[in-house]
Curated annotation (Swiss-Prot):
Compartment(s) of residence: Secreted
Annotated Pfam families: Pentaxin
The species this protein was found in: Limulus polyphemus (Atlantic horseshoe crab)
Binding-site residues, Ca(2+) 1: 85-86, 169-170
Name recorded for this polypeptide: C-reactive protein 3.3
Amino acid sequence: MKTFHGPTCGTAVSLCLLLFLTSALEEGEITSKVKFPPSSSPSFPRLVMVGTLPDLQEITLCYWFKVNCLKGTLHMFSYATAKKDNELLTLLDEQGDFLFNVHGAPQLKVQCPNKIHIGKWHHVCHTWSSWEGEATIAVDGFHCKGNATGIAVGRTLSQGGLVVLGQDQDSVGGKFDATQSLEGELSELNLWNTVLNHEQIKYLSKCAHPSERHIYGNIIQWDKTQFKAYDGVVLSPNEICA
């Protein structure tokens, strides 16, 4: 386990992260997790994706997460463009409810049957389709109450922005707020340009052995996509469901 500090080592960290994730999955027994320590200005632990996303009219975003506390708003995934800082945003509030923002439209807030437990791994999937504006959230394989239609109907998530994990961007790559950050861990984050069905989402939420996981994102793939680590992010091997 190694902690990387500061943007000056960003390029090297990207290579280390990619190599670490790849070798961990090839072992067939472990996957990798990323730990985000507490934020305190001017230190905002985060992962920043190398490159950008394409234009998207459908998405499924899934990941495993574990939180150390429920205070403020815990931002997991932020995609910001020059025109919209909340082009795509996922977060957890103090009540343990998930919020999902697509293309700057009103946030979808849901209550899930599975409560979020501090210190325990949970799996979440967010889906959205431009055609009817259907947006859903499922936690641990179960759909939440409050899923809706009419969210950003006919819109396209624009290419050219920046993906940040663990912080909320109020401008592209910046204007972070310590009360809008993740204190916890992420793993197995994948993004698709289509809406996965319920059976696929249920399968992803199971504690399957890494060698038995066959559904990986075609836009972001946890063991392939490169990220740069900043401000004390910790990378380590992990058995997700241990």
